[in-house]
């Protein structure tokens, strides 16, 4: 599990250092670069935590547990797994973008409801108090790809917050679509500085955790 996290953090840090993905708050004519991650691609990286020393990091994510595609019924959503790994590495604060109305437990029923929300351009109400993103130096934004788009609740979050002068590093879980161009949607909704998006297959995040933990344990013994 930590190897995926190291790849995510290393890519984001490299982009921060190089100033990648800066559109100056303007819409870009081309999509930001997208990285796709697998366990085998993850490389060990040293000093990752130090890059975030003294910085306030917010890791806002939307995730759904229950029945999911190709992984069956799960207690922890795929995107939540990645968000928690990022929090462990960066010391960032987690915020779950959770809608007041829960989605059905069954996968087919849930994605049909999500499709209806997308087609009618709904903005589901978010449960709980929202964080003030102006209090943070950087925001990681995580979500699953639903119907080639962000979950509508993520739009609710983005439109209620003020991202002026902020940097957003998007990451997603998917089963073949990659980022699906959602980095552009985030940029349009926030006018924030965007870093390249990172896409991780949901089955990798969900099913490879034990294997990754064992590989990581061997590497430090």
Predicted features by range, described:
Residues 106-193:
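Helix-loop-strand module that forms the ligand-binding subsite of alpha/beta enzymes
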Residues 93-95, 193-201:
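Short beta-strand elements in bilobed, periplasmic/extracellular small-molecule ligand-binding domains
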Residues 75-82, 86, 150-154, 182, ...:
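Stable alpha-helical elements in mature extracytoplasmic
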Residues 64-67, 99-103, 145-149, 174-179, ...:
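Solvent-exposed loop/turn segments at secondary-structure junctions
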Residues 220-221:
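Conserved small/polar residues in nucleotide/adenosyl-binding loops
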Residues 15-19:
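C-terminal motif of bacterial Sec signal peptides marking the signal peptidase cleavage site
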Residues 21, 31-136, 148:
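N-terminal beta1-alpha1-beta2 submodule of the flavodoxin-like/Rossmannoid cofactor-binding fold
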Residues 1-4, 8-9:
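Positively charged n-region of N-terminal signal peptides that target proteins for export
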């Amino acid at each position: 599990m930590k190897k995926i996290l190291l790849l995510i953090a290393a890519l984001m840090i490299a982009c921060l250092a190089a100033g990648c993905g800066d559109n100056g708050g303007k819409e870009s004519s081309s999509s930001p670069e997208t990285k796709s991650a697998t366990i085998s691609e993850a490389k060990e990286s040293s000093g990752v935590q130090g890059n975030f020393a003294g910085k306030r990091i917010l890791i806002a994510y939307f995730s759904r547990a229950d029945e999911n595609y190709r992984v069956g019924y799960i207690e922890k959503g795929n995107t939540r797994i990645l968000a928690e790994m990022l929090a462990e590495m960066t010391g960032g604060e987690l915020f779950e973008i959770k809608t007041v109305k829960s989605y059905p437990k069954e996968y087919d029923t849930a994605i049909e409801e999500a499709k209806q929300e997308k087609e009618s351009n709904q903005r589901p109400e978010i449960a709980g108090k929202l964080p003030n993103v102006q209090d943070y130096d950087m925001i990681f934004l995580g979500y699953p790809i639903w119907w080639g788009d962000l979950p509508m609740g993520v739009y609710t979050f983005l439109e209620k917050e003020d991202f002026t002068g902020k940097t957003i590093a998007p990451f997603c879980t998917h089963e073949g679509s990659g980022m699906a161009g959602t980095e552009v949607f985030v940029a349009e909704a926030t006018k924030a500085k965007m870093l390249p998006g990172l896409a991780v297959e949901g089955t990798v995040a969900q099913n490879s955790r034990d294997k990754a933990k064992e590989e990581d344990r061997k590497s430090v013994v």
